[in-house]
């Protein structure tokens, strides 16, 4: 038993020892000895007998021998054993399976990592991690230095920088990006019109020309530039550009500050319009309105003064009589035959006579005649008279001189035969009697006042009244008699049982105790009163009166509820005592006690129910009156609501449109304003103000209470509700500050400009401002023949059927004429050029001799040039045999008069420097890497195009294969001969190959000198540079071989 206990203790100790991890660096170990009883083996000696062969014949040659041998035996003994013991190293203590370091001082903000050594949390330091990092350090033991800039705070734990407002970056070294500001650069800048934003506070630094908190406003009129501090110098109504200060002059003014009127002959915006005035009229420099000279009128002073007027603006009236003609300039009269005098007012004949010798009497009615013509005797009638002898009045509908003027009177009015004045019929007024009398007036000239009452309408002719329903009488003051109703009281009432009939619609208002449309039904049993809404409260009764509710007591009963046998007011023996109950209470016939009516209490029913109760015996509690100044009514229990509330419990707000006590008053709020249900005060919808919200916001303001100022420009109106700008025609944008985009104009920029030929379009009206040489509403027409220039207002001066350029006015002369105005006869040689403007210095004979001489010299020069060219080609061929160049073609050919098709990067390696195209072309094509599917040769190109404009290659060429051929190449190597494909093809200017020449055996390109050379257009001299010169590609060389 002792042995077993000892073994268990040892086993437990061993287990405890083995619990620590020996691999743990904090676990130390040492060897310890212990004694163990063991069974040990040893060598035990013994005498071993064995036999050997010998010569002892007796023992059959076998002899016995002895030797000491050993065998393994076992015995008990004590053995000293050693074992490794694990324990925590010094400075550590054991905790479970681990060895934990031990710190004498507790690590406040950290952990103990080795004996008496703390590892602090980030942001803390000191031996026991109890000290926080200063503002310049962070991390464990505050060992890291903060990198934050610009006043940023450093996180003592992570070292992250908490940037001040306006900065960003991991070290807060950068300002906020444009367009942001504030803490963390999270706030967007509100600045507009290109203004910069302070990265810290977001304050806007406005660009020149803008102002306001957010730079949303242009400089006020009269200022411009940075901070709107510069004063505008513009005069005469000129507006100043809010940024530059440049003056935009109003029409009629020009100059840097708009101080100068338009020069004579011009007017309008920028003085760009020519005055259209004729006959010496002067043009207003602002409007262009013509101020005509005496005798002329009209927009352009093209019209003479009309008959009967003269002078400036034709404002003076001629005073010529008897048909005399008035000079439109001076007003002098030119008399008809038979009259004389400054105003032709004197007859040559005496009054009453006419004819030759003034012997014939006038046939006219003297009273109605102005005069008798002294020659013909024709009568000139007074206004309002007509006929040959002026004895007939004007026919109906005409008046005035000769009864020629039609009357304009309306609605049956009379027209005065002389003046045409209208005499209006009753009920109408106005100059031509076109206006009916205003409400409340009638009669001639609407001078009488209507006397209709109670909404009756008055006839504008005679003032008779048309009464509304329910009224009658001449002035609608009499209501319909009892039993009638309706228009003119023509309807009869059908109400029964004394019910009243509405004089307007005939509806019946029943008396108490009756029901039905015509009040023909009595109240149902158990009900009484108005609309039968009350319930009978009787005990010993046969119902109650349907009108008053009085109980009809059965025989032997009396009292209000028929619950008393004594007569009302009596009780006691023989009902001898008078009841003293008040407020309708009844007394008991036995003891005279009062039974109070509903709503009353007390011995004599002299008091009303206490607050909060009502009804019989004041036993019913009042309902919860939500919005009431006092409890319910002591009799009915109905809640008496405060102003603004309704319903049985006063818990309902007045319906929309009503307010006040019992919601009986009608709200007066207009324009969607909301009405307070208590006092009827109006809370206005945005855009309206006033006691009843009937006043719109004044111009320039909007929103609730018209608090906000409008920001619209260029005459735009501002919505009083939300401040939205309604732009005037020609403007767009949120604040109507942007003109319509090009090609658009008008309202909302929704109309498309129709201007043609480069004309500019007014962004407001869409009116086209034509360029020089064009006219028409949309500038679609050239100037008419004979005119040119701006507005087609200049007249051409070309002569002899020549044509005039509609823009410049240049004359294009007909054959046989010359000169600036084509007014000079041209000589024969000049007829070849109809546009010449220089007269020859020689006569016709000298021209002929000179022409012949020139032609001969030209032919001689051509022969010499051809000879030199042939000699040059021969020398080139001879040199070519010696040099034997390798020619590499990358053609982009265009050969006229052919049908071949070539394109692509075509190369050839030939030792010959010449070949005949028409004969060897097929062989060349066979040996070439070109195919018809990769090369194109267009025969439709212009055969006279210059080599300076190479065609666009349709082949895909290597980068080094294109050489622009602008001039012949002068080099040591000869030209490559490229003859025509056919004898008919003499012009090969269109052949544009890119030719590269690489000298055999040379490692560099041949140098060349480039001369400026442009092939002439529209002309060609056969044999002159018919062959393209060979030109080495400037990009070709050894390096190019490496690339390929």
Swiss-Prot record:
Keyword presence, Repeat: yes
Disulfide cross-links: 28-89, 54-63, 88-99, 103-118, 120-129, 146-154, 148-161, 163-172, 185-197, 191-204, 206-215, 228-240, 234-247, 249-258, 271-283, 277-290, 292-301, 314-326, 320-333, 335-344, 403-415, 409-422, 424-433, 446-458, 452-465, 467-476, 493-501, 495-508, 510-519, 575-587, 581-594, 596-605, 663-675, 669-682, 684-693, 710-718, 712-725, 727-736, 753-761, 755-768, 770-779, 792-804, 798-811, 813-822
Positions bearing carbohydrate: 270, 531
GO process annotations (BP): homotypic cell-cell adhesion; retina layer formation
Residue ranges constituting the EGF-like domain according to the UniProt record: 95-130, 143-173, 181-216, 224-259, 267-302, 310-345, 399-434, 442-477, 490-520, 571-606, 659-694, 707-737, 750-780, 788-823
Compartments where found: Cell membrane; Basolateral cell membrane
Topological domain ranges for the Extracellular compartment: 20-848
Cytoplasmic membrane side: 870-1044
Gene3D superfamilies: Laminin, Tie2 ligand-binding domain superfamily
Entry GO terms, CC: basolateral plasma membrane
Segments of this protein annotated with the region Disordered: 1023-1044
Membrane spanning residue stretches: 849-869
All copies of domain EMI, residue ranges: 24-101
Residue stretches of biased makeup (Polar residues): 1033-1044
Membrane topology field: Single-pass type I membrane protein
Keyword entries, A-Z: Cell membrane, Disulfide bond, EGF-like domain, Glycoprotein, Membrane, Repeat, Signal, Transmembrane, Transmembrane helix
Signal peptide extent: 1-19
Pfam families the record matches: EGF_laminin, EGF_PEAR1L, EGF_Teneurin, hEGF
Subunit structure: Homomer. Does not interact with MEGF10.
Function as written in the Swiss-Prot or TrEMBL entry: May regulate the mosaic spacing of specific neuron subtypes in the retina through homotypic retinal neuron repulsion. Mosaics provide a mechanism to distribute each cell type evenly across the retina, ensuring that all parts of the visual field have access to a full set of processing elements.
The protein's name in its UniProt record: Multiple epidermal growth factor-like domains protein 11
């Amino acid at each position: 038993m002792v042995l077993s206990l000892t073994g268990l203790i040892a086993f437990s100790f061993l287990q405890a020892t083995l619990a620590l991890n020996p691999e743990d660096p904090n676990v130390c170990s040492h060897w310890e000895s212990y004694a163990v009883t063991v069974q040990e083996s040893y060598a035990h000696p013994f005498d071993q007998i064995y036999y050997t062969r010998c010569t002892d014949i007796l023992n059959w040659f076998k002899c016995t021998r002895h030797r000491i041998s050993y065998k393994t035996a076992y015995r008990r003994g004590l053995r000293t054993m050693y074992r490794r013991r694990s324990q925590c190293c010094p400075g550590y203590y054991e905790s479970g399976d681990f060895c934990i370091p031990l710190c004498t001082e507790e690590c406040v903000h950290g952990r103990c990592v080795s004996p008496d050594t703390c590892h602090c949390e980030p942001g803390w330091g000191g031996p026991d991690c109890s000290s926080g990092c200063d503002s310049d350090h962070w991390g464990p033991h505050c060992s890291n230095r903060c990198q934050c800039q610009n006043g940023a705070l450093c996180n003592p734990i992570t070292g992250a920088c908490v940037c001040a407002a306006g900065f960003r970056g991991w070290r807060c070294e950068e300002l906020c990006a444009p367009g942001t500001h504030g803490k963390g650069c999270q706030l967007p800048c509100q600045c507009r019109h290109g203004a910069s934003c302070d990265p810290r506070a977001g304050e806007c630094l406005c660009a020149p020309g803008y102002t306001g908190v957010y730079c949303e406003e242009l400089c006020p009129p009269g200022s411009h530039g940075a901070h709107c501090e510069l004063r505008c110098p513009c005069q005469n109504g000129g507006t100043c550009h809010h940024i530059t200060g440049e003056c935009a002059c109003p029409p009629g003014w020009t100059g840097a500050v708009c101080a100068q009127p338009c020069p004579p002959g011009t007017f309008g915006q920028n003085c760009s319009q020519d005055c259209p005035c004729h006959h010496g009229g002067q043009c207003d420099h602002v409007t262009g309105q013509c101020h005509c000279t005496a005798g002329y009128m009209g927009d352009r002073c093209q019209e003479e003064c009309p008959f009967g007027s003269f002078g400036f603006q034709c404002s003076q009236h001629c005073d010529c009589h008897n048909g005399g003609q008035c000079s439109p300039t001076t007003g002098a009269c030119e008399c008809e035959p038979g009259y004389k005098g400054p105003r032709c007012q004197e007859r040559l004949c005496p009054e009453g006579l006419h004819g030759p010798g003034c012997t014939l009497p006038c046939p006219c009615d003297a009273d109605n005649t102005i005069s008798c013509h002294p020659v013909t005797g024709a009568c000139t009638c007074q206004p309002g008279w007509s006929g040959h002898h002026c004895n007939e009045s004007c026919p109906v509908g005409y008046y005035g001189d000769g009864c020629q003027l039609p009357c304009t009177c309306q609605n049956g009015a009379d027209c005065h035969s002389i003046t045409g004045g209208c005499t209006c019929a009753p009920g109408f007024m106005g100059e031509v009697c076109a206006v009916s009398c205003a409400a409340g007036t009638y009669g001639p000239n609407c001078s009488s006042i209507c006397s209709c009452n109670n909404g009756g309408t008055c006839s504008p002719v005679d003032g008779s009244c048309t009464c509304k329903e329910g009224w009658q009488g001449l002035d609608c003051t009499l209501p319909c008699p009892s039993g009638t109703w309706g228009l003119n009281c023509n309807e009869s009432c059908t109400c029964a049982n004394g019910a009243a009939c509405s004089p307007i619609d005939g509806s019946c208002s029943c008396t108490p105790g009756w029901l039905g449309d015509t009040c023909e039904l009595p109240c149902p049993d158990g009900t009484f009163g108005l609309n039968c809404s009350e319930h009978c409260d009787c005990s010993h009764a046969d119902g109650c009166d349907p009108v008053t509710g009085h109980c009809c007591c059965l025989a032997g009963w009396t009292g209000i509820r028929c619950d008393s046998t004594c007569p009302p007011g009596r009780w006691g023996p023989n009902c001898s005592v008078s009841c003293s109950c008040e407020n309708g209470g009844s007394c008991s016939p036995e003891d005279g006690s009062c039974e109070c009516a509903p709503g009353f209490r007390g011995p004599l029913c002299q008091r009303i129910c206490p607050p909060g109760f009502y009804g019989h015996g004041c036993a019913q509690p009042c309902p919860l009156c939500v919005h009431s100044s006092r409890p319910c009514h002591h009799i009915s229990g109905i809640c008496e609501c405060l102003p603004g509330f309704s319903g049985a419990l006063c818990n309902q707000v007045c319906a929309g449109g009503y307010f006040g006590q019992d919601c009986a008053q009608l709200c007066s709020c207009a324009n969607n304003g909301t009405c307070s249900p208590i006092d009827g005060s109006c809370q206005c919808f945005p855009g309206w103000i006033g006691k009843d919200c009937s006043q719109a916001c004044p111009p320039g303001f909007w929103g609730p209470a018209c608090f906000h100022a409008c920001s619209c420009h260029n005459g735009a109106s501002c919505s009083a509700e939300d401040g939205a700008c309604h732009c005037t025609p020609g403007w767009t944008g949120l604040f109507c500050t942007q003109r319509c985009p090009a090609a658009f104009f008008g309202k909302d920029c929704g109309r498309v400009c129709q201007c043609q030929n480069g004309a500019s379009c007014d962004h407001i009206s869409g009116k086209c401002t034509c360029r020089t040489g064009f006219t028409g509403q949309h500038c679609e027409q050239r100037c008419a023949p004979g005119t040119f220039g701006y507005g087609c207002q200049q007249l051409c001066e070309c002569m002899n059927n020549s044509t005039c350029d509609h823009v410049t006015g240049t004359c294009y002369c007909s054959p046989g004429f010359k000169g600036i105005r084509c007014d000079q006869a041209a000589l024969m040689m000049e007829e070849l050029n109809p546009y010449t403007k220089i007269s020859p210095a020689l006569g016709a004979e000298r021209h002929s001799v000179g022409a012949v001489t020139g032609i001969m010299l030209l032919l001689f020069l051509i022969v010499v040039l051809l000879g030199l060219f042939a000699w040059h080609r021969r020398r080139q061929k001879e040199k070519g045999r010696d040099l034997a160049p390798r020619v590499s073609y990358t053609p982009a050919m265009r050969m006229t008069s052919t049908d071949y098709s070539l394109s692509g990067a075509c190369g050839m390696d030939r030792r010959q420097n010449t070949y005949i195209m028409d004969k060897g072309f097929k062989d060349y094509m066979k040996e070439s890497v070109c195919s018809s599917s990769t090369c194109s040769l267009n025969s439709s190109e212009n055969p006279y195009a210059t080599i300076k404009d190479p065609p666009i290659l349709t082949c895909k060429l290597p980068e080094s294969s294109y050489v622009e051929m602008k001039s012949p190449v002068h080099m040591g190597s000869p030209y490559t001969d490229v003859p025509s494909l056919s004898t008919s093809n003499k012009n090969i200017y269109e052949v544009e190959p890119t030719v590269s020449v690489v000298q055999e055996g040379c490692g560099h390109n041949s140098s060349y000198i480039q001369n400026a050379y442009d092939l002439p257009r529209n002309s060609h001299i056969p044999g002159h540079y018919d062959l393209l010169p060979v030109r080495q590609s400037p990009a070709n060389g050894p390096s190019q071989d490496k690339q390929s």
